Amino acid sequence: MIMITIKLGRDYTQDLINKCGRGGVGGGGLNGIFLSYEGVV
């Protein structure tokens, strides 16, 4: 999962991290990243 985001680019990965950090989906952490990624796709 993390490897996929890195391949897509640092900006894309940082965007996912920011979305997770802003109280969003899953409250941050790996769960937040997974949910945010699914939401983007």
Curated annotation (Swiss-Prot):
It comes from the Eukaryota. This is Putative uncharacterized protein DDB_G0285945. The lineage of its organism: Eukaryota, Amoebozoa, Evosea, Eumycetozoa, Dictyostelia.
